Amino acid sequence: MSGTRASNDRPPGTGGVKRGRLQQEAAATGSRVTVVLGAQWGDEGKGKVVDLLATDADIVSRCQGGNNAGHTVVVDGKEYDFHLLPSGIINTKAVSFIGNGVVIHLPGLFEEAEKNEKKGLKDWEKRLIISDRAHLVFDFHQAVDGLQEVQRQAQEGKNIGTTKKGIGPTYSSKAARTGLRICDLLSDFDEFSARFKNLAHQHQSMFPTLEIDVEGQLKRLKGFAERIRPMVRDGVYFMYEALHGPPKKVLVEGANAALLDIDFGTYPFVTSSNCTVGGVCTGLGIPPQNIGDVYGVVKAYTTRVGIGAFPTEQINEIGDLLQNRGHEWGVTTGRKRRCGWLDLMILRYAHMVNGFTALALTKLDILDVLSEIKVGISYKLNGKRIPYFPANQEILQKVEVEYETLPGWKADTTGARKWEDLPPQAQSYVRFVENHMGVAVKWVGVGKSRESMIQLF
């Protein structure tokens, strides 16, 4: 061993210095992202909260889902509809980023952009960056989505109520390792074409009635490839640079919601991706220590689209009133939403999974006309109170909800712009939610516009 030194036989002092530097480097985790997530079954008004935060954001990103999500944002009296584009694209000073966890239907992306261009959205393609690792939704994925729904209806007498945007079939291809990504489309097109044909044939063998114009679709895809090429980056490197360069405000816009999450939602009536906080790390390629504030968006009552258990649902004049006053129709599907009282069991469960740092309580004004308002505070199963949210749908159908009845305010809140403008009973309603959740409410929404979000702190 002469002439060499054992690794643990270093000259005094050298190891300590190196370790200290590494500890400092580890401590410099970089910027933290702010996350906005739905805390119920979607349609909570996430777009409005994102829009509020996006005004001073440097980067606004989507991390999961596809054009099955629907966000409506009103700016200067104009209503923009977003499905795949981050709604931060309205902010001309921000970069919008579509992460690897998102599934992208290119025809849908350009169609959506063109619709919003007609309403005044300018130069969006200069502000959009797309991860090269994002998977592609093909037209046949969308066709299969519809065929699967028909099959489910025939076999089980019920369907999931998907948006038929091809999201589930695309995530299935991804999990089966047969999917194709943006990076595949932009490299060797012959190789891409061969894999595309294989994938198309696989789907045709499973669904014999499926018709696919393979050559026509490939021709269109080749055209889209050239249009998106300038927007595509290595998404992991892009996010790393964004978080470790000069300080930046990075906002993550969740699509869908906690109870639609593939793991934690009311399975099987869920979407096909993780729309809870874990999906931010896997869908953007960032570590947990870069997650900052996580804002949960909560509607002042509860809505749900399609079938599945809904403990606080009101199939009566209260449900109709909420549906009509709240204009509860889906942005993506136009379907009527089911309505019911606020359910704190759902919210506590969403908080367990996501660790909300604060809440946004939206559409409080919809409750303005009620003389009393009920809030679901706990569930009973076979006469016993249960502390958890049941995983099994049949059990969730059977729970008995315990309600607390609060006085209504019977006053118009739509003109309120600060906390003091709200009637005392409306303030009590907000505080009741805070106290039961153990999470502060940061915003209260009393209307459609940006100005109607009251900030509390």
Curated annotation (Swiss-Prot):
It catalyses: IMP + L-aspartate + GTP = N(6)-(1,2-dicarboxyethyl)-AMP + GDP + phosphate + 2 H(+). Pathway: Purine metabolism; AMP biosynthesis via de novo pathway; AMP from IMP: step 1/2. High levels in muscle. This is Adenylosuccinate synthetase isozyme 1. One of its GO terms (biological process) is aspartate metabolic process. Gene3D superfamilies: Adenylosuccinate Synthetase, subunit A, domain 1, Adenylosuccinate Synthetase, subunit A, domain 2, Adenylosuccinate Synthetase, subunit A, domain 3. IMP binds at residues 43-46, 68-71, 163, 177, 256, 271, 335. Belongs to the adenylosuccinate synthetase family. It comes from Mus musculus. It comes from the Eukaryota. GTP binds at residues 42-48, 70-72, 337, 363-365, 445-448. Mg(2+) binds at residues 43, 70. The gene is Adss1. Its main location: cytoplasm. Weakly inhibited by AMP non-competitively to all substrates. Inhibited by IMP non-competitively with respect to GTP. Inhibited by fructose 1,6-bisphosphate competitively with respect to IMP. GO terms for cellular component: cytoplasm; membrane. It is a peripheral membrane protein. It is an enzyme of class 6 (ligase). InterPro entries: Adenylosuccin_syn_GTP-bd, Adenylosuccin_syn_Lys_AS, Adenylosuccinate_synth_dom1, Adenylosuccinate_synth_dom2, Adenylosuccinate_synth_dom3, Adenylosuccinate_synthetase, AdSS_1_vert, P-loop_NTPase. Optimum pH is 6.6-6.9. The lineage of its organism: Eukaryota, Metazoa, Chordata, Craniata, Vertebrata. It is found in: Cytoplasm; Membrane. GO terms for molecular function: actin filament binding; adenylosuccinate synthase activity; GTP binding; GTPase activity; identical protein binding; magnesium ion binding. Homodimer.
